[in-house]
């Protein structure tokens, strides 16, 4: 299977490079590495916590605000949110207005629909305690990025304005109680009634770049130090920083370089990008959220123009 092939490729690379330890990146958290220290949460724990049904039950049992989650839509009132039980980035999430639009299949869960601003907290844990680095605004399904539905398309750090309730403190308590290590994230919806926990991510998050830019902290170094029982102090915010993922409106081939000082995750010329897949990320910094958002939108328009011209040639 695909998982076995990934394990093989990692083993081959480890054999060639011979590192002191391995840190697994997003999407590889449950990969198996033999004969070396792996500086991540244990794979079994990550797999368990990545299960959205397990998360909802755990949050409820431990007294944290949660979204009601069921293995079928029968016990919930419509409309319901339908999403994969395992998965990230808002892929496969949709709202079913009634039972005729449910399109139920194996591996899905149903949740009550909750409205609010999407936010996250970036946290470092040492297995017993935890320290929040920053609260972030999450960009979800923003049309100017080309993202559709509930697709994650970036963040702005810090979250402005901060909610009255201390989501950073709540995120620290969740990560500490779960006994998580290294870099973890807690996603929230900020509703009129207060914050609700959406999910816990036991991995490096998409906010890494904006957290580093806005605070000056080295998240990877903080991750490594946590395995020695060292937690950073909560950093001060120095500026606002944003990252947006730009999605392809149609399938096309990259004809020219998209490498600029403000782009990241850049595909090589000649790469084929399929419709609705990410093209690249854009970065911006400024003195406040409004400034950062305006710069991100300007850069997004420029990338759209370049890739539109590119795909028409």
Predicted regions and their residues:
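Conserved ATP-binding module of the ATP-grasp superfamily
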Residues: 57, 65-67, 79-82, 91-120, ...
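A conserved helix-loop-beta module that forms one wall/lid of the active-site cleft
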Residues: 36-99
